[in-house]
């Protein structure tokens, strides 16, 4: 196994610089993009900044954050910028740059071409999945995974241990780096890391668990347990994660949804096996991806877009290796001959992708939820509680106590969800208001029973198409 060790930090290549410029411009244009789940992080941070504690609802110590590292990194920028939404967006954007650059340096370990090593960055900068996940921890997670691969192949075990610990704090699934790398070490020509290399990652993860227990009175975040419970109940159906993965990949490099582009990229990715120097990387990354995907698929976890970010990042690295392998074997060696092709690709992507990307993502994702949240803030008492299924946008704009029907930020609800019981939460946490979809979603089935018992009164002044608002058990109607 040989690596290219002549990596020039001063000359990263025009493709990488161009990709970073595209990412910077797009992120600036899409800065107002608000992902519903990102606003959950933002509300935790805003409450912390306002002195209400690191909580979703003031006075309720429930841990609904599955990425503690992302939350911690967002605190200072949120405080400086004065708005938690800007804090999470800034960290997410900076991590997107870090992810692109990290994968560039990973590929430079195996190939000599600056331009081809930067191809994953260009694909990332032109793909909608990068911007759909802005405000979430996805880019931080992919950056730490890439950095872990880099440190592994550079045999920097001590730094690798720290990086894996941080990856686990970015998303718990980072733990799958451990068995993947252990198998590579066991069956490959590598020495095991010294004991000291395990100390800091153990301390990092252990400290977070201790904090969870002392602050929230629970070792694990309620949001993670809630999603496990949703999977156990069969809420999302069988094979939902895998089917959604296949559906998402049809987008390939554009937002047009072209299957032909996807299959072309897939063939290029398969050709990555031509690059002998990268085969250990292919085995390691694919092993990690197999563990990661199996976890979500076997537990029937919800198919959230940010869960697939690592699939795209690794896929793009395989595509770049495939292009390099084909050029080395059949065409030419070096950067100069591919520059014209990459320029055409970049310009084509900008003209085809950018207008559609900006038109579809250039505004808040859930404008209806935003308007509902504002209405609740103006037409309900400040101490009122509202039960809803999707809590992020409505919770942020309503500034009301939120009861989460699916249990992400409301304690003890997830155990009912695991049993397929979407009604008992109502007895445990009776709200002042319940907002539901019209027609009802399955998760809102409790409304039917309570309505028959005469415990609900519809709020006539709430006139949002596709939604209804009820007062519960004689609570004061909306003003």
Please give the residue ranges for each predicted region.
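Membrane-embedded, lumen/periplasm-facing catalytic core of multi-pass transferases
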Residues: 345-395, 401-439, 455-479
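Membrane-lumen/periplasm interface segments of multi-pass, membrane-embedded glycan/lipid transferases
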Residues: 43-44, 50-66, 213-272, 297-298, ...
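Specific aromatic-rich, kink-prone transmembrane helix
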Residues: 102-105, 122-123, 140-160, 182, ...
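Aromatic- and kink-enriched transmembrane "portal" helix at the membrane-lumen/periplasm boundary
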Residues: 64, 68-71, 85-102, 118-144, ...
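Hydrophobic, aromatic-rich transmembrane alpha-helices
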Residues: 100-104, 182-186, 250-293, 319-325
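Hydrophobic/aromatic-rich transmembrane helices and adjacent perimembrane loops
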Residues: 167-170, 176, 258-261, 284, ...
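Transmembrane alpha-helix segments characteristic
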Residues: 17-22, 164, 198-208, 276-298, ...
